[in-house]
C-alpha cells in the first residue's frame, strides 16, 4: 500500500464505488409527480389528457413550491448531479425551481416553456407577444440574480416543441437566445404522428429540424439540446 504525503487527509472508501455524477440531458420537472403512470395513451393524446392539466397547476405558487421540492429532493438523492430541465410556461414557478436546484447544490440548465398554440386555454400563453414578454422578464431576473451566464443553475430558451410555439413565437425566442447569449432546448422527431403534424404546420420546411433552424434554434451560434431524436 502507498502512504499519503504528510498533511493529506485520507478518506477510506474500501468496499465502495466512486463514480462521477451522471448528466441527464432531458428532464420534465413538473411531470415527476406522476412518473411511471398514465402510460395508456400515445404521446399527443397523453399531453392533452394528462400532462397539460398537471402542468397548469404550477400557476399556483404553493403547488409549484411543493411539487418542485419533491423533485429536487429526489434528484439530489439520485446519481444525477447535472441536468437540462423543462419547467412549465410559468415564469415565477420556473424561478422557484431554479432557486431550489441552486440551494440543493445541483447544476442545471432550466427552461421556461414557450407555448402559445395547440394546448388548452388553461395552459397556453395568450399570444406570442405575451410569451416573449414573460421570457424576457425571466431572463432579466436571471441576469439580476447573476445566473444568466454564471453559477450552477442557468436559463435555457425552451419552446416546448414546434406544435406548441407559433412562427412568431419561435422567431422571437431565437432572437432572445441570440440577444442574451443563452442556449436552447426542445423536442425533435418523437414519433411518426408528431413528425407528420410538424410537416403540416411548417409546409416550407424539408425536415423537422428546419422548423427550429430557420429561427436560429438548432445549433450554430445557439448551443442546442434536442430531446428524443
Where are these regions (language model features)?
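Conserved acidic residues
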Residues: 7-8, 81, 224
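Histidine-centered catalytic micro-motifs
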Residues: 20-32, 183-192
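Short hydrophobic "helix-edge" motifs at membrane interfaces and signal-peptide entry regions
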Residues: 15-17, 69, 177
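Short N-terminal targeting/anchoring amphipathic segment
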Residues: 12, 24, 84-86
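Alpha-helical scaffold segments that flank or form the walls of functional sites
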Residues: 35-106, 131-149
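Short, function-defining helix-loop hinge/capping sites that tune catalysis or transport
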Residues: 29-36, 168, 195
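Metal-coordinating catalytic core of metallo-dependent amide/deamination hydrolases
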Residues: 92-229
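Histidine-rich, glycine-flanked metal-binding segment
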Residues: 1-19
